[in-house]
Amino acid sequence: MKKRTIRSIPQDRTSMLERPALERARDFAEVSCGYTLDEAVRESERCLFCPDEPCVRACPVGINIPGFIRLIGERDLRGSYDVLTDMTLLPAVCGRVCPQEVQCEGVCTVGGSLEPVAIGRLERFVGDRAIAGGWSSRPDIVPAGLKVAVVGSGPAGMACAADMAKAGCAVTVFEAFQQPGGVLRYGIPDFRLPNEVVDAEIATLTRLGITFRCNTVIGRLFTLEQLIDEMGFAAVFVGVGAGAPTFMEIPGESLNGVISANELLTRCNLMRAREFPERDTPIGIGRRVAVVGAGNTAMDAMRVCLRLGAEEVACVYRRSRAEAPARAEELHHAEQEGITFHWLTDPVEILDDGKRGVRGLRCQKMELGEPDASGRRRPVPVPGSEIDLECDTVVFAIGTNANPILGQTSKLRLDGRGYIAVDEELATSIAGVFAGGDIVTGAATVIQAMGAGRRAAAAMKRYLGLADTDVPYALAGGEGLFGFAAEQRDHAPVRFA
């Protein structure tokens, strides 16, 4: 293959077809339509196949990005899928929801001169082709004679479960809700991540022999100690996420019509409240909705409210648009669909309509001061700038905290924020119990949670004697990938009992 240069590759990033905003804003069908084969091949021709692979180093799970893209260009889609699934069994999910613009695409060499290679779109394309073709990637597995429990079936739990199953362990995943998937199932709407895609990716895990046990709340039905001492699990991974909603503690939060984005999305996505009364779960959304926050969850909540029939939906955020933590694509989609944005606006009180309902949101205008610990400029109140926004529903999407159930019912040591404390191997204060993902770090991305799950699996294999003890190990955030040094990203030497 002739060496590619910036001048020799297609200069423009291949666009992806999207449904018209006015059409899609009233239904839950997926917004982005994905690449065709010809579009994917054309975009693959923009990759320079850099020898230092900055995109691979920026991926929390170490996907061989040039490898899978090269095979797309050769139209070997099954080979491309096999390369992807060496490191992730969720390509159709990650291609849709990972923030590639601040990870792999953010360091793409092409992006220094042109728009970066659309790595996420290409990953989604291959994942979708695999689902449509019924492909699966099942390695030769030698039974290790060990049982492993995974608590939580979100991204961290699924990644850990997959690696432990590949190592020959009999893996049982315990899920509190009635369906597996964690935040992929209850936290992300169908128009961004269809349930059918989640179902298909989970089916890939079941083909590895992984068992999902739903409607089982560890910490209530069983303790972590019981899993090991009484149920025969040799090791346990806790990846339950951090789903307890955060509020502002301002007057009026107890009024009818105030809800967290977590509850809104869970009712709509998991319990299918949007199909009420055909489904049993109702959800009360008024004509005018104010959503507080500007992250991805806030964007999802606003766009869901539109689809539930709200006539006006507004975003209220105390910083400017430039500081909004939402992905650029999600913010763009929300703007296209008619969301109103009140930047530099901070709620101070929810107004009572006299009947314990909401009639408005009193806010104070802000201006940006000096940078705070996050590196963003701190919002400072502007004296005498209060305004009242008319609304009958207020949705809070300002972050989450750790669910306290596990910490209250076992000997787990927690940190000062209420998250599970772990050492550098992600081991907890209970022997044989490991933890990772949002329940350790606080809210993060899907791919970061998957990276934590893989890193924990590597540590669990060492703990169980299934991996060589001299495998190089790297701390999270270092040059290594999911617990192995960079040079070990393709595989680690493993032995079976």
Feature annotation, model-predicted:
Residues 1-35, 336-338, 346-359, 369, ...:
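Mid-to-C-terminal Rossmann-like scaffold of FAD/NAD(P)H-dependent oxidoreductases
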Residues 68, 92-94, 101-151, 167, ...:
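FAD-binding core/adjacent interface of flavoenzyme oxidoreductases
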Residues 254-286, 371-443:
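FAD-site-proximal beta/loop scaffold in flavoenzymes
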Residues 170-173, 177-212, 302-349, 470-485:
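Rossmann-like dinucleotide-binding cores of NAD(P)H-dependent redox enzymes
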Residues 146-172, 298-306:
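N-terminal Rossmann-like FAD-binding beta1-loop-alpha1 element of flavoenzymes
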Residues 439-464:
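A conserved FAD-binding loop/helix module that cradles the flavin
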Residues 24-43, 63-96, 113-142, 268, ...:
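Ferredoxin-type iron-sulfur electron-transfer modules in oxidoreductases and energy-metabolism complexes
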Residues 36, 207-229, 277-281, 344-392:
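A structured beta-alpha segment of the ubiquitous adenosine-cofactor-binding alpha/beta core
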